[in-house]
From Swiss-Prot:
Single biological process term from Gene Ontology: translation
Assembly behavior: Part of the 30S ribosomal subunit.
Name by which UniProt lists this protein: Small ribosomal subunit protein uS10
Matches recorded under PANTHER family: 30S RIBOSOMAL PROTEIN S10 FAMILY MEMBER
Keyword Ligase assigned: no
GO CC term (a single one): ribonucleoprotein complex
InterPro entries with a match to the protein in the record: Ribosomal_uS10 (IPR001848), Ribosomal_uS10_CS (IPR018268), Ribosomal_uS10_dom (IPR027486), Ribosomal_uS10_dom_sf (IPR036838)
Family statement drawn from the similarity comment of this UniProt entry: Belongs to the universal ribosomal protein uS10 family.
Disulfide-linked positions: none
SUPFAM superfamilies reported for this sequence: Ribosomal protein S10
Keyword NADP on entry: no
Pfam families with a match to the protein in the record: Ribosomal_S10
GO MF entries: structural constituent of ribosome; tRNA binding
Amino acid sequence: MARERIRVKLCGFDVELVDQSSRAIVHAVQKAGAEVLGPIPLPTRMHKFTVLRSPHVNKKSREQFEMRTHKRLIDIIEPSQEVMNALMGLELSAGVDVRIKQ
């Protein structure tokens, strides 16, 4: 018999915001009385971009930029209506993308 669970996935560019949001979600869910697994850190995705410093000369002179995407996974085991209300009432940072799957 499979246990019902909700999977919350957090993504963001700032690791502190992602961790702060994951702590807020875990605290709210535990306060509502559900079992929580996580936050589980997922691999950080790094995108590197190399561009020319000058628009028309100095081909060897280049600049590199990096964009890191941090991810966390939280599983909520057998959620109740109180847990769902607690999740919907949370105010999270604008820099964190939250995806909820059932």
